Regions:
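Surface-exposed, low-hydrophobicity beta-strand/loop segments enriched in small/polar/acidic residues
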Residues: 2-148
């Protein structure tokens, strides 16, 4: 089943979670064992610049599964607090994209059911395309997985 954003952020980070640093060029991550993807958390989202919706993509590549993209978007509350929203899209549905999108596009979406991935599949995190000067910088990324 899918998760609400509150449920997603309440998931405890288990042993074996991979904590990595992202760059604008992206990075790949392959656990080498069959695993279940629970989610991806990012810190320092305000470091993402040059894009109207301030989002970056998390993609899981696999030969027998649709490409799935976690789209992390920032939104500012009335008091100036910046919050992160995480939405999972699959390749068979249209994911918002482009410099014209705003965080409001992501506000009511919820994650889809998560899948299990084989050891030969890898995860890639990189900055969203579009806009100028898009960069994640030294944003901290925590990939939350459970080995099977």
């Amino acid at each position: 089943r899918g998760f609400t954003m509150a449920e997603f952020h309440a998931i405890p980070i288990p042993l074996g979670a991979a904590v990595v640093a992202a760059t604008s060029a992206g990075f790949s991550f392959s656990p080498g064992r069959k695993f279940e993807l629970l989610g991806v958390r990012m810190s320092g989202l305000t470091a993402i610049t040059g894009h109207a919706s301030n989002h970056c993509a998390f993609t899981v590549l696999g030969s027998d599964e649709s490409t799935e993209i976690w789209d992390y978007s920032t939104d500012s509350d009335e008091d100036g607090t910046t919050t992160a929203k995480a939405i999972l899209y699959t390749s068979d549905e249209e994911a918002p994209g482009g410099a014209g999108d705003t965080a409001k596009d992501f506000e009511t979406a919820e994650t889809k059911a998560l899948r299990t991935y084989d050891a030969n599949q890898s995860c890639i995190v990189k900055a969203a395309k579009g806009g100028s000067g898009v960069s994640i910088g030294d944003t901290g990324v925590t990939i939350i997985i459970r080995y099977l």
